[in-house]
Amino acid sequence: MPRIYTLVNQKGGVGKTTTAINLGAYLAYYGQRVLLVDLDPQANATSSLGVDKYRIRGGTYEVLLGASPAAPLILHNPRLKLSLLPSSPALAGAEVELVNELARETRLRRALEAVAPRYDYILIDCPPSLGLLTINGLVAAADGVIIPVQCEYLALEGLGLLTQTLDKVRQALFPELGVRGVVLTMFDGRTNLANDVVAEVQKHFPEKVFRTVIPRSVRLAEAPSYGVPVSAYAPQSRGAKAYAALARELLSGDGVSVPEVAAPSPSAKEE
């Protein structure tokens, strides 16, 4: 069975989708069979992989509503060796439509059970909120959550609330829910604040912070507009190298050997 991680943070703009896409791309690059699940009605992960969110034949909305199993809606990118269960703006209505349904919090987990044997890793990209969609993502996180945290002061404010939500999900729905790790993003070592944030996050989640820190990177910000992860857009950039290192760190921590693979092709887009 695959390792299933949910990327979650109710604060927007912390690099959650960026981390989901680029971590997934590098896990695939290192030989893992990866499924990325877009659970956000904004469908940014879908768009960032070059998929038109308005023209998909179905995605997480249809899966959660029981209109379709997941398998026929999964898209595979042969170039990236990465699979995607896409999202669309229609997903915004799912929380209202599911409000009176039984077992509504476990819909995603049950839907993924049928396709799970096909993959080594499933990464679930949640919306920046703590509603029913995110609860579905948390309950499906068989191997824990990955929490991206921007290295800025305001990013710290929501950590306490997120911790409370995780505790509530453990108590009511999924006692085994754990934190796989915290990823520090948009790090600028030139500022004292960034280093202060690192120290504060380590207080909240002792021994859970990934060693790899994701720097601020123009190339990371540009890549989605080209519909590709940074590994395909600017593989020699600092951001690309950081996500490659994060993927290796995750694999190592999961007891998966990292194969020797050729370096990504050089790109003119470097930092």
Task: Tell where the protein language model's regions lie, with residue ranges.
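P-loop NTP-binding core
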Residues: 1-271
